[in-house]
Amino acid sequence: MSKQTVKNKLHKLTFPQQKEEQPKKKAVEFLYIDADEDHVSLQFKEKKGDLETGENNWKNNCVLAKLVYVYEGIEPECPKSKRHKLVNPHYFSGVYDGADNAELWDEVYAYLDSHYDLKKVKKIYLNADGGTWIQSGKKRIAGITSVLDEFHLQKYLLKMTSHLKDSADDARKEICDAVKSGTKADFQSVVGQLKVCAETEATEKRIEESGAYILSNWTAAKIRLKDRETVKGCSAEGHVSHVLSSRMSSRPMGWSRTGVDKMAHLRAYYWNGGDMLELVRQQERELPVAAGTENEVLSCESMLRWERHRHNKLGKYIESINHSVSTEVKKYAWFHAHIWGL
């Protein structure tokens, strides 16, 4: 099967609607939503050759493939395992640019409402990095509590203290105490002390930017550090890697916007346990030939007979047919007939 055929099949792919409401909704105390995105490279935006190059000679050819997944908590993979797995996860993914972002969160809410008794849910935690498209989910789903994910919190703590070497651990503990139990003024005081110890302007700028990030996500960071019992660690970075990046961006690839959206939906469908053969069966078939011409299929013998007749009529120097069906076409015809015959 050629690359062009794969692209055509992917772009025409349609997905089944979400299943109807379950007879009995689950009753759980806490629900968790993790969200992040994958940065996928485009070959073009609207048409080939329309990519712009910035001042740093980098092409502006990135599109966000968004990933949101809902789960009930975590549990060990086996009784004595140190590794954990998500309990009943469900994935949502796609491009969802601009106003379509609301559609993504509406899909998440529809799933929650159809599978859980939301009146009995005490809290819904949203673990994320504070991105704008993620925070907009709070406008579509009431009662969400934002939590800054551990990865980004530790990332900016390390940025603020990496220049302190042996004293870095003590400095990080002081910062965490200020966020957990103090006020913004206490935190800014600690940031000021760190800037005094900075040896270069670059280090001072890094401390200032990291402090500004934590301040912009102040409540979410405070909940992360204070509510350790019910707040679970965020696995969004790992899930983006496994669900999206492994297929779309870990290796050099160029996509179209439609291709990114369809492949992201397909990856979510696969990780939700979707049946690939059933998905193939549900696709629209190509339109049949016009009525009355179904049986007008020329056999090889009739084609050769027609060519001989044409050859005699037009002269011996007329070009004759000398071709056979390729192995690739034979394989495609056999595979297509086999799939639809299941």
Q: Which residues does each PLM region occupy?
A:
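Catalytic center-proximal scaffold of phosphoryl-transfer enzymes
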Residues: 1-342
